[in-house]
Amino acid sequence: YCSEYFSTKWASIKGLPQNMTINTQYQKVIDYIKKHKSHTKEVAMVGGEPLIMKENNLLLDILPEDVLVTVISNMTTDFDKFPVPNKLLGRKRVGWSMSFDNIGKRFEYVRWGSTWEQLNKNVTTVANRINNSQQHGGIHSVYNIYNCTRLCELKQYALDKGITILWQYV
């Protein structure tokens, strides 16, 4: 969770009013990509939860099909309620970084408010796409106190889905 203080910190660092909407900056990015889309090779959707951001929906509409889209997601979004996940699944070149560290009830404990059922459904959907297309990716997990005794379970889960794990150490 980011408090309001941190979500507006970037504006104060740049000397901008904190009540300035992100639409101005976003429109500049969209205009730049439209102008240079023939030279755009990769776009990264990171920060917040990119699968629910309306801005990413428009971005996917203007990106050429050959542009690689990389996304870091906690994978807890209901894919049926937002357009971005399905647009990504329909593209040829997507790199998925699925950010979670535990499975089952332990996942629900660490990601309070999320359900294992939803995450597992989403990971299964993305893993099937990865295994049958040019899309790529896997689990990006942080080795921590909540999973240090359950690493084999997470590894087996990844193997069963046919995806990899990239371990991030803290």
Q: Predicted segment positions?
A:
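Core AdoMet radical
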Residues: 3-27, 38-53, 64-81, 87-121, ...
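Conserved alpha-helix/loop element of class I SAM-dependent methyltransferases that forms part
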Residues: 32
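Aromatic/hydrophobic pocket-lining residues that form the small-molecule binding cavity
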Residues: 56, 119, 151
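Conserved Walker B catalytic segment
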Residues: 57-62
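Hydrophobic positions in alpha-helices of CheY-like receiver
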Residues: 63, 123-130, 158
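Catalytic cores of alpha/beta
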Residues: 145-159
